[in-house]
Amino acid sequence: DTNKIVPDGPTISTNFGEKAQNRTYQDLLKNKFDEHNFEQLSTSTIYKVSIDGSVKKWMDDGMYRTISFSPNGEYVMISQIKKPFSYLVTYSRFPTETNIYTKDGDFVSNLLNVPLIEELPKGFMSVRTGKRSFNWRPDKGASLTYVIALDSGDPSNKVDFRDEVYELNYPFSGQGKSILKTINRFSGIDWGTKNMAIAYDTWWNTRNRKSYAVSYTHLTLPTKALV
């Protein structure tokens, strides 16, 4: 009932004296009516369609953001948008919840709960703290990698390494195993043969980008830059 979401007063923003930068975005949510429309348009239900054409409800209604199956097809990583919404930033910084399920839809573990992000340190290379960038390793059946900022997400902090990459296996809980640290902001890994991978980092301020050869048998900071 949209009549129940008609504002009964002004929209109020509060600043608590903290330093933060926010870009100016167009077409943000502005009121409860916008929130209602956003939720209606972003909510969906996941169904499983078998080869024989049969259709079965697989996951309840939710504001699903990403769905990614493990390479062996046994597990699926699902991220959902959660409330509260924001009138200051785009939906990419709304709260999210990321969980692992079996291929049959059974819950396995909660990977991540990211709160609303309205404030970040100044700079294009700023990131939020905590675990981020969960991805399946394509060279393994069901192994995840994720990244943690070692500079508190603030590019103005002087540190030896900006990011640390971890590997996380079943049951997909806890810290996992550290496999790599990068001097600049980590931007990805191409998993190659059984003994070699190519890792990348980047730094926008200097337009610097490095590619490194990484040995699977000794996953520490690579010292040989390819380019």
What are these language model-derived features?
Residues 218-227:
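Single conserved hydrophobic/aromatic residue that forms the stacking wall/gate
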Residues 1-219:
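Beta-propeller folds
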